[in-house]
Every structure is written in structure tokens, then in C-alpha cells.
Amino acid sequence: MQKTILKEATHIVLINSFNNFLPESKERNFILRSLKRMEIKIIKGQSKNMLKEFIHRSFMPNDINNSFKNIFYKSLENLNKTLLLNDLKQLYINRDFPVFLKKDFKIIFIKSENDLILDNESNDNFLDFLNRTLDSKPIFINLAHQGHCLNNFNLYEILFNKLND
């Protein structure tokens, strides 16, 4: 996203977001090992099945739309391993305050109840941080029956209803 867009923005919608992916709890070592296994599979050219499983878990508890699944599987043929590895390595980094945030942003923070990708602690820590740091507390929306990737619901309707309460 272009920085000028963020500089001009007054509202931001964060969906299943984090500042630091790795939690501080005992789950940290498990997640580190999982990331390392993913890294090794990418390096060894064994990433197709891993990515299929990742996408499947991203949508759980919902099913993946067949047209999306077909597009995704087809895109695995042209996978940029270098870019994928670089993105994966970003998950190891602990960050301070996100540079794109201004303290006067109005933030809508959406969290999926059944996210199997992002550890609850990482998500909750980011929300706690925003609550302490921003001028006004984020608007919190908890989505039942949704995974990391949102599926079969109307985001516009949810945002409209929440903002007009």
C-alpha cells in the first residue's frame, strides 16, 4: 500500500492483525519450529502441499470456495520462492509501534474467533497495545465461525451496522 494513502487515511480496518507474530508464551517455541519447517520445505522445493494445507487451515472452520481453490492451486505453478521466504522471515521480527499508524487514527479491529493461523496472544497483544497507545480505543468486532481468511459473510454490512450503532 502506498504511504500517501495511509498518511491521508482517517480510518483503518485491521483484520486478524498482529504487530509481532510470535507470542511470548510457551506457544512461541512450537510456532518457531513450525515456521522453520515451512522454511525448509520452501528451500527444498516441497512447498506445494504445505501451502495447500496452510490455505485449508486459513479458511477453517469454513470450506474454501472452489473457484478460489482452483486459482490458488494454479498459481502454485509460478511460485516465487524468494519472495515467499522473505515474507516468512518477516514473521520472526519483533517490532515496536507500527510506523504506519498515527495516534489519531480511528481503527476497526476485526478478530476471527476460530483463527488457526494467528496465535490468539499475538492478536490480543496488538489490540491491547492499540488500546493503550491510540487517542481513541479501536472499535472491536469479534467474528464467530470465521477463520484467518474470512469467508461467506458481508464485511460491508458488518462495518455499516457497527459504525451506525
What function would you assign to each model-found segment?
Residues 117, 142-158:
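Catalytic histidine-centered segment of alpha/beta-hydrolase-like enzymes
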Residues 102-103, 108-111, 115:
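Short beta-strand/loop motif that positions the catalytic acidic residue
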Residues 116-122:
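Conserved alpha/beta-hydrolase "acid-adjacent" motif
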